[in-house]
């Protein structure tokens, strides 16, 4: 048995590059933040399938013909802290099949999988990427076959199959505050880099509104406006040193992206962000806090205004209480550290 927890991922700005034939070449350029809260996955082998044709012994130089075994079964149980209609057990089953085809898992093994999801789905928190990455890494931990990048690549393939995200898996692969400069699966052709920034942050969402990523990345008008704004932002950021010194510029680019991509023009997002900003003003946190949209949910994140002045958990808990009174949900989490890859 193996258990792995992978935090979620929020995207602050991005462009869409999903026209390539192969899933490994599809993805996004963009910038985002990896989270402490996410998805925990446990996997346990629960037996082997039956032999459907017994092998034969051969004379001469030929090897024996091995037994032919049926494909193993996969039983998936999902526990979501926040119930959602978007739960997909099949997604996890498909990842197991992908790893079987890559010969990283035995074809005849039966598996029992338990998934614990800590954040809401379809709110831009990267839960599909976190869940798939956690299952992939749990399989690696269980078998110790292959290498970690192979498992991340498989997770990216399945996420693209379900249009669950574009660059979330690549972002999680590098961790921290990340910049994705070339689309695709990790470790290649996707290219990304990250840095660590230790701070509490607050995720905010409107439960009555949720958006599946495919509503945008599969829509030609949204795709065009998002990609124009996202590519321009990444081009500017990519010329700079990617460390904590870029923080203020990243916050500015995220705000510009929301406006240029027209995401800020959507009434539900506009209303939510205005409500959050009014609480920022009410609690006199204007100098400490910046609110930015999470792509692509009806959600936002409260981030430190300065990289060297992390947010206090007590301030964010007070903020969360106030949001509850205006029917906005929230949770305090942290920025996850950069991964060593």
Where are these regions (language model features)?
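ATP-binding N-lobe of GHMP and related small-molecule kinases
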Residues: 1-121, 144, 333-341
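Solvent-exposed alpha-helices and their adjacent loops that cap or buttress functional pockets
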Residues: 4-5, 23-24, 32-35, 106, ...
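Short glycine/serine- and small hydrophobic-enriched flexible loop segments
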Residues: 97, 134-141, 235, 256-259
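Phosphate-handling active-site elements
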Residues: 104-110, 139-155, 312-318
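DPxDG-like acidic metal-binding loop motif
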Residues: 123-148
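Alpha/beta catalytic cores of group-transfer enzymes, especially the acyltransferase/condensing modules
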Residues: 149-194
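Acyltransferase
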Residues: 194-261, 265
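Glycine-rich, charge-dense phosphate/pyrophosphate-binding loop(s)
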Residues: 244-341
């Amino acid at each position: 048995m193996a258990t792995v927890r992978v935090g979620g991922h929020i995207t602050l700005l991005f462009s869409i590059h999903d026209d390539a034939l192969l899933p490994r070449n599809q993805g996004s350029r963009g910038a985002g933040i990896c989270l402490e809260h996410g998805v925990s996955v446990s996997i346990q082998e629960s037996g082997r399938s039956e032999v459907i044709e017994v092998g034969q012994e051969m004379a001469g130089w030929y090897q024996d013909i091995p037994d032919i075994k049926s494909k193993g079964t996969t039983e998936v149980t999902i526990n979501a802290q926040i119930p959602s209609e978007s739960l997909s057990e099949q997604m996890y089953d498909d990842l197991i099949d992908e790893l079987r085809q890559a010969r990283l898992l035995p074809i005849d093994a039966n598996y029992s999988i338990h998934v614990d999801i800590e954040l809401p789905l379809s709110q831009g928190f990267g839960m599909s990427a976190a869940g798939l990455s956690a299952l992939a890494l749990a399989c690696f931990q269980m078998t110790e076959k292959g290498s970690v990048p192979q498992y991340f690549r498989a997770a990216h393939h399945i996420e693209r199959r379900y249009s669950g995200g574009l660059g979330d898996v690549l972002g999680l692969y590098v961790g921290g505050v990340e910049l994705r400069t070339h689309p695709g699966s990790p470790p290649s052709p996707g290219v990304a880099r990250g840095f660590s920034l230790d701070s509490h942050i607050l995720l905010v969402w409107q439960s009555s509104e949720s958006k599946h990523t495919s509503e945008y990345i599969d829509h030609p008008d949204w795709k065009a406006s998002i990609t124009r704004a996202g590519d321009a932002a990444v081009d500017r950021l990519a010329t700079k040193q990617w460390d904590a010194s870029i923080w203020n510029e990243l916050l500015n680019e995220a705000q510009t992206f929301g406006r240029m991509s027209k995401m800020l023009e959507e009434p539900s997002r506009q209303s939510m962000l205005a409500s959050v900003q009014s609480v920022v003003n009410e609690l006199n946190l204007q100098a400490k806090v910046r609110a930015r949209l999470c792509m692509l949910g009806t959600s936002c994140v409260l981030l430190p205004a300065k990289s060297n002045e992390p947010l206090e958990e007590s301030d964010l808990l007070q903020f969360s209480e106030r949001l509850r009174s205006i029917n906005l949900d929230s949770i305090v989490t942290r920025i996850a550290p950069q991964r060593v890859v």
